[in-house]
């Protein structure tokens, strides 16, 4: 599992603060997606994270927790922890501060941790607001963040996050052209096979989240087929 994640092309993001009936969970888990990421920005607790984990654990898919902060990290039974640092945040808290708190408060399973260099590009999103991200970047500015993340800090993942809004393919292309070693993730507004294929042209891995709740499993399956 430690390196198999590098081969994923489609990840489904599930929010612990949102609920889905068991039948829909079953359709998601059998859609062909490579992994399930348990992740949210607001109102994530150990309790609702644990509840979501119990819903999805039975399917045998790789399970990733992407914690929003040190107060809600689930490790037991989870394959990997994808831990974001928001490169374009105006606050050191979201780059390294919360990570320092986590290390001070907890005994961390570092063998499960995969660091992510987030570049947040939707100022209206919860993650954009909470982290104070500078979302008005030009393609050249965003690419520079990605280059620093890849070549200087050696992040294994560079994650372009539009969070609920479909992004600019030219922006993603500019970032893809400077990322050599890291795996490039794209998330935001993928609500059709065409959008999945368009972003999948530049990103190594696409992440589908809101469409699961807004449009249902059929759309999710279409996005899987578009990139696999």
Swiss-Prot record:
GO terms for molecular function: magnesium ion binding; phosphoglycerol geranylgeranyltransferase activity. It comes from the Archaea. Its cofactor is Mg(2+). Pathway: Membrane lipid metabolism; glycerophospholipid metabolism. Sn-glycerol 1-phosphate binds at residues 13, 159-164, 189, 209-210. Its EC number is 2.5.1.41. InterPro entries: GGGP/HepGP_synthase_I, GGGP/HepGP_synthase_sf, GGGP_HepGP_synthase, GGGP_synthase_archaea. Keywords: Cytoplasm, Lipid biosynthesis, Lipid metabolism, Magnesium, Metal-binding, Phospholipid biosynthesis, Phospholipid metabolism, Transferase. This is Geranylgeranylglyceryl phosphate synthase. Prenyltransferase that catalyzes the transfer of the geranylgeranyl moiety of geranylgeranyl diphosphate (GGPP) to the C3 hydroxyl of sn-glycerol-1-phosphate (G1P). This reaction is the first ether-bond-formation step in the biosynthesis of archaeal membrane lipids.
């Amino acid at each position: 599992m430690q390196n198999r994640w590098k081969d994923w092309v489609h990840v489904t993001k599930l929010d612990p603060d949102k609920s889905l009936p068991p039948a829909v969970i079953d359709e998601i888990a059998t859609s062909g997606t490579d992994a399930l990421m348990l992740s949210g920005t607001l109102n994530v607790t150990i309790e609702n994270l644990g509840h979501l984990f119990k819903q999805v654990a039975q399917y045998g898919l790789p399970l990733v927790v992407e914690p929003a902060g040190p107060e809600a990290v689930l490790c037991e039974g989870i394959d990997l922890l994808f831990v974001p640092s928001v490169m374009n945040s105006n606050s050191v808290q979201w780059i390294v501060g919360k990570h320092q708190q986590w290390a001070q408060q907890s005994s961390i399973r570092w063998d499960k941790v995969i660091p992510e260099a987030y570049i947040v590009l939707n100022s209206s999103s919860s993650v954009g607001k909470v982290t104070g991200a500078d979302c008005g970047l030009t393609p050249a500015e965003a690419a520079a963040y990605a280059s620093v993340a890849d070549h200087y800090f050696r992040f294994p993942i560079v994650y372009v996050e539009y969070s609920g809004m479909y992004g600019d393919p030219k922006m993603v292309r500019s970032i893809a052209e400077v990322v050599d070693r890291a795996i490039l993730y794209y998330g935001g507004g993928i609500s059709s096979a065409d959008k999945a294929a368009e972003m999948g042209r530049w990103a190594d891995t696409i992440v589908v989240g809101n469409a699961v709740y807004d449009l249902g499993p059929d759309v999710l399956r279409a996005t899987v087929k578009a990139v696999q």
